[in-house]
Amino acid sequence: MLFNLSLIALITPLFTGVLAGFFGKNIGKVFTNGVTILGVLISLIISIYILILILGNPELVFNQNVYTWLSIGSYKLSIGLLIDNLTVSMMIVVNFVSLMVHIYTIGYMHKDPGYHRFFCYISLFTFAMLSLVMSNNFLQLFFGWEAVGVMSYLLIGFWYTKESAIKANFKAFIINRIGDMFLILGIALLFSIFGTLDYEQIFNNAESITSNTVKLSSSFEISSLTLACLLLFGGAMGKSAQMPLHVWLPDSMEGPTPISALIHAATMVTAGVFMLARMSPLFELSTTALSFVLIIGSITAISTGLLGLVQYDIKRVIAYSTLSQLGYMVVAAGVSAYSASLFHLMTHAFFKALLFLAAGSVIVALHHEQDIRKMGGLKSKLPITYITSLIGSLALIGFPGFSGFFSKDALIEAVSHSSVYASEFAYYCVLIGVLITSLYTFRLFFLVFHGQLKDENINVKEPQLSILIPLILLAIPSMLIGWPTIGPLVFNDFFANSIIQPSSNDIFGYEFTDSYHFLTHSLSGPVVYIAIFGIFVSYFLYILKTDIPEKLSTTFNPFYKLLINKYYFDYLYENVFARLFNNLGNSLWSKGDIKIIDNFIVNGTAYRVGRFSSRVREIQSGYIYHYALMMVLGLALFLAWVVFKSSGLVL
């Protein structure tokens, strides 16, 4: 039964997405959104039912191949399903946020000519993400990985007549291909070592190859397992937008706002974090890989958060917040606190989707204005959006009692107790990141909702119910889900059958027993007070003394320029690497393709054959005496050769 239910949960969004894509214009808007919403709702209900089954039987793990995709000799590549605690948790998060986005889209996209196409894309994306998290082997993981990449490309460039959207989706596609190259190499290395792509077989035999090495040069060799982990993490860096492969995510805000909530908050960008947790049996055997993961996550968490302080596009501020929070999740994975990483992934999915959709509500109310400098005073005009945005903001900064408080504090607590190399550096990075998060979050909140309305003549009102209902439904878990779930998800062994966590790194199991003890402990630490201090600083800078931010940007102009130019990563990629490869491509085209292949090989061969033919053709004059002369000359040469050969002069 579990197999059939899992298959239905996976296939339903695919079926409804295809239905909307092929027949959407014929069946109408109401039927299009109805059938796609029903598909995701069915998948969500099944996911919740599977969770109930697992809670009744904590040891329940379903791992079964559906069919053999390819068989070569003794090698078999299969498509299968792995249903365990980690899988079902991700299924619920993906389906719930997807359902909210589907409902939200009814109002947000109701006037868009691509309405049916949009519903098709988001349903197919949901299927791709479910395929990724439900896979039991690297082959299916890769298919799902690439499928979400393709759907992201289509959704970012949904408004394909908009030049900036086309550039953004191309940029996302190219940057992710760099990460995917590392992922492919990592999978290929594992296949060459183990002769299989099945998770269970690889994880069970991983410890036996810890002494195996790969010689990268005559003087340098590396553990094959470490190399595989680093390559896999390279793939995660692209999908989860870790520095320096982070530049695609802010530009992806060119797509419709619902996509920002679905792809760039709750699902696709967390795929890399999910993979790190799923691959914990491999990463736990390589301290080098864990330290590398930790350092990259730490740098991403603090550096991308700083960029959020200087952005003025409402969606880009939240996008840089997403980058920073992804860094937090990666940091937790780097100190082997996979349960804390996954817990923050889940709470973040709710409150970040809420913030993106609330931003969309503001954009709709202001007739598609996105510059926060042109906003203000919307508190009384958009009361529901205001309250839900406040809930999302408090959850994001980790205010006591909200979901983000429990997940972020658990994560930071794990880092503070870690003995992994660079954990002290990571601790200070995430601690400073708490202040930065609070600053950019309430900078955005105060500039949008407080102060004076910039244009008194503009008609501002709350959008329709289809936009407001998802905000309310997302606000509930953003506010309440932390307290009841941190105990089973983090302190207990909920993920015990999904991840490997050595007892030396499991600080939660012996330091805390329930939510109350964790709450009282956190209130005695610095994290909460740093976050609250950030709120007061933001209020002072953007409500009381609004001239100070400009003075600060002038005083610290070099640093401000560095942030405004996003550390010059875009400049480096576009004007150095892109130009270098563009020039290389043009050179290969003009000299290699045109001169060598076309002119010398293809056209040159034809030219030389023609020249030779024309010379030979001159012999065929049609005069008999010419042919007789040639016969005499040929006979003379033949006789000369016979004479010389008989005399021994010719060998």
Protein language model features and the residues they cover:
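Membrane-interfacial helical/loop segments at transmembrane boundaries in membrane proteins
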Residues: 60-76, 198-217, 407-418, 487-519, ...
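Hydrophobic alpha-helical transmembrane segments
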Residues: 76-94, 215-236, 425-434, 509-535
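Hydrophobic alpha-helical membrane-insertion segments
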Residues: 38-55, 179-192, 389-397, 470-490, ...
